[in-house]
Amino acid sequence: MRIWVDADACPNVIKEILFRAAERVKTPLILVANQPLKTPPSQYIRSLQVAPGFDVADNHIVQNVEPGELVITADIPLAAEVIDKGAHALNPRGEFYSKENIRQRLMMRDFMETMRSSGEHTGGPAAFNHGDRMEFANQLDRFLAKTSKS
């Protein structure tokens, strides 16, 4: 089992949680980004810089993720693709995407995109906060505990 990270937009505090978790449970962590990333020295952690371009990092993750693996992303279309491949998707705020909720998230995303393109000011997501960080850490720990038992 590997953990993949859509790392370009992943908050640094989430990356730090992931670095510690990878070391603790001895699980490969792969950060995929269009730009160079700093990672701590570890046999379990590596960063992969892909070519610049729209969805290049996402496409690399989709092509390489295996069923049962975990992908950390806030990108809803990427989450939908990895779920279709049998992988798990967790966003940096600690919400797991699932077959049950991903279609609704995609429809809402598309609706908001349509509103913005028509000139409507929809605002963005709430600022990332301590509660989000804690929820992410808790969900990640539960997932890793569950997968280590199987």
From Swiss-Prot:
Record-linked Pfam families: DUF188
Xref: CDD domains: PIN_YqxD-like (cd18720)
Organism superkingdom: Bacteria
Matches recorded under InterPro entries: UPF0178
Matches recorded under NCBIfam families: PRK00124.1
Family: Belongs to the UPF0178 family.
Protein name: UPF0178 protein HCH_06960
Organism name: Hahella chejuensis (strain KCTC 2396)
